[in-house]
């Protein structure tokens, strides 16, 4: 990989000033050859930081945000391959890199395999199920398998979808809690 990436929209408070609202955006992705298109909206969030903004702690359940990730990654049936683009956003500097586990489970919830990846702070990682786990491991996982994406060092964000030779389908974004 190397021909992928992501974009972060941030307010720069280094020179002072004040934000007049949360950043929001609507993105449309289109494959010019196939005509396949996908849209997603994204509202601003404060990621991987312990801070108070305008007198409000940026926390979701009493704890500082950004301390962990638990995502469910649906795996498509053959002939589809599943893709996932994980992003490690940071509103202020956080850990230098993630310690992210991709835990492959069979349909009964038993862990079949685990792979550790490291995503740089403000970086991203694109992977496909078929390239991440070998054929023997995928066969052991069987139909109905899924991946749990787990990280105890940071909160990740991501996109996921299904691919096949003649096209693909993009699902909405994923948040890590």
PLM-predicted stretches and their roles:
Residues 1-177:
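Gly/Pro-rich, tryptophan- and cysteine-flecked surface segments typical
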